Amino acid sequence: MTENHYLLLTPGPLTTTKTVKEVMLYDWCTWDVEYNTMVQKVRAKLVSLATKEEEKYTTVLMQGSGTFSVEAVIGSVIPKNGKLLVCTNGAYGKRIVQMAEMLHIDVVVSQTEEWEPTNIVEVEKILQQDKEITHIAVVHCETTTGIINPIVDVCKLGKQYGKVTLVDAMSSFGGIEIDIAELQIDFLISSANKCIQGVPGFGFVIAKRDELLKCKGQARSLSLDLYDQWETMENQNGKWRFTSPTHVVHAFYQALLELEKEGGVRARYNRYYNNQKLLVNRMGEIGFKPIVNEKYQSPIITSFIYPEGNFEFQQLYNELKRYGFVIYPGKISKVDTFRIGNIGDVHEEDINRLVDSIAKGVVIG
């Protein structure tokens, strides 16, 4: 466990290393050449993490939470006469639908139960029947439950039917290997405070250059204009249009260096995967069962069903917080669950200490 007042067992914000925190002790100017050069390095490193075909893609950094970046894509990429198909099985897919509706974008939904992955057969049926669909969006890791959706199949179908593909990889990018060129992803969205293990403050979009160039003049917002943000960064050496989160960018750059030092995305995936397997096995020993089938479960966060009896999540939360752990309440609409994340600077000994705290009767007697 790192030096921290709590170990965050959440899907982000998450527990960061001491060295990531330390780089935020200093102040920087947004116009400084050294800072803008760092922004350019960050952009390049993100593309190299995303694909080997780096010349075809570019990165746009966007102030705010990851949701801001998702909305920047939805509001900038889809033209006025466009139509969006959203695959949803959780809160974050629903949020994309809500964005589209607020922005007066024609939207159709393929919905499955929160503990079931996107139904590829239904998606293809919708694409066959509705020729007006121009774009298709899917959440890779839906942290409502921790389920992984079949983005390979969704994107393959999307391209088979000539659609632009949008992937919300908020809680998977940097923790699960993804080659966006191989998967034919046109726009991938993620955030600083997820698997790369930075802190909150900006999101980013890795975009296919050819598709991004089509977005000029389409944005439905000034501050969330994806094309204008990219054009400024691209042509003015990493400059942001409006005040950027300088401390967060420095922390993120440090986090990228630490990802490389750990061994890259594959090594980080292995740590997360081992954390999650240990968590499920140990929690199973004391009577807690995950809601998601193992074959669909991500290594990011796990939803556990409330056990029978007099179980109160708030008591669990309060007691674990006293012992230095913070977990997440459930977000599933039909089943009582709570969630435990295992990303961030979290290791085997941390998972064991957590479950030991529960098993000893700290919460459940």
UniProtKB/Swiss-Prot annotation:
Record field: catalytic activity: (2-aminoethyl)phosphonate + pyruvate = phosphonoacetaldehyde + L-alanine
InterPro entries: Aminotrans_V_dom, NH2EtPonate_pyrv_transaminase, PyrdxlP-dep_Trfase, PyrdxlP-dep_Trfase_major, PyrdxlP-dep_Trfase_small, SP_NH2Trfase/AEP_transaminase
GO term, biological process aspect, one: organic phosphonate catabolic process
Entry keyword Transferase: yes
Cofactor: pyridoxal 5'-phosphate
GO molecular function ontology, one term from the record: 2-aminoethylphosphonate-pyruvate transaminase activity
Record EC number: 2.6.1.37
N6-(pyridoxal phosphate)lysine carried by residues: K194
Keywords: Aminotransferase, Pyridoxal phosphate, Pyruvate, Transferase
Annotated function: Involved in phosphonate degradation.
Self-association and partners: Homodimer.
PANTHER family attached to this UniProt entry: 2-AMINOETHYLPHOSPHONATE--PYRUVATE TRANSAMINASE (PTHR42778:SF1)
Family the UniProt entry places it in: Belongs to the class-V pyridoxal-phosphate-dependent aminotransferase family. PhnW subfamily.
Protein name: 2-aminoethylphosphonate--pyruvate transaminase
Organismal lineage: Bacteria, Bacillati, Bacillota, Bacilli, Bacillales
